[in-house]
């Protein structure tokens, strides 16, 4: 249904005096009086959805820039690319902390008060499931961005909080995601308060909760190994496999691979359209300003011909550039993803020496904004597509990754399921003898610019971090090397992979502590 999108257009920070973020926590009477019927709960949930859509994985998360695959970068993004820690400590990406806790607050408001509203038990479970899922997703974001983080008790407490260990933060996410899995129906059975079928995949479902849990357990197992923490990494990998299997076997809803990469790209390019491969999405707000419109990471590389105002030469000015020679090294010539993901015609071929770039068309339509100066000229500021958080190909490859870590031979079958659709040579192709690396590279090819690569690198451990995040890059300052190229075990334990806690979190809170690594660069 499009009703969620309509509400997002209306409600997202559009009337701050009525915003739940502006309701003071101590005003418990306001909560009690507000939740009278299900429509009131729905209203609170819509603001939660809007905040979730605006901030989960958005531009403020500088870690995504470290993971992006590109040959050339504009200087604006060189700080995260090169790990310029003094620049990053100056506030690059501070919003992730506040926005994640805004989402937690809104979810807690529903969890603590939905029972006051008059509705059936099934409908109450539906909204508790939605809020639990969103809260779990927010804590997952906090664990990945900051490691140790605050775990709030509720939406009304005014006490000061210190940070809890990263594994406790992940466990909090898991508890909420598991509650969502228990309470929510499969996507095909989701209904709104009028009884109409829900078609927006920003609503959580049993399948979305399973996908979140699959990634949570894969992440927990990986960080236990990476940081030498106490825990059962093998057990976590098996749980991730189990949740992936529920999705693949259609026991958590009906999801399946599209017939071809071209069919996938067409489905991902239809905002709000049916996409049988997609499991959970964040709704694009096509009317909002630039910050809200930036959803799909690929927008930063997408120019000609998707951008109707762009030329071949304009690709040089994109924030990130991928060279065509890199595409040729990544994909076999027969791989159907080449034609689906990239545009190639005689004009491009004839100008490769002058403009040696790949022209991305994985998402096919732009959104244009008129200049604020009053000019009639338009600028493509976004792609008309929702941000697909998880899809079936991701789940096959995540299961393969966890299986290979446990030495399970079936990992090869999961990898080849994705390769078969792409018409790529099945594993092992000539020269392939490292299944773990082959799975990582397949995720790189299949999920290109879908905001997975940074997490994929970290899950694969220190050697991958050094090789795939430790860039050397020619800049205006000369050749610069990312310190991650030489990262030590102590650097990792000190928190080099996390964003610094923003200064605002320390205001009137003597319990807050900075991540040890960042004490080299900040005084708070």
Give the ranges of each region predicted by the language model.
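Active/binding-pocket-proximal capping segment
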Residues: 393-397, 409-425
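Short coil/turn linking the two alpha-helices of tandem helical-hairpin repeats
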Residues: 143-145, 150, 188, 219-228, ...
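Sec-dependent N-terminal signal peptides
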Residues: 4-12
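Conserved, well-structured interaction surfaces
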Residues: 35-56, 76-146, 158-171, 175-192, ...
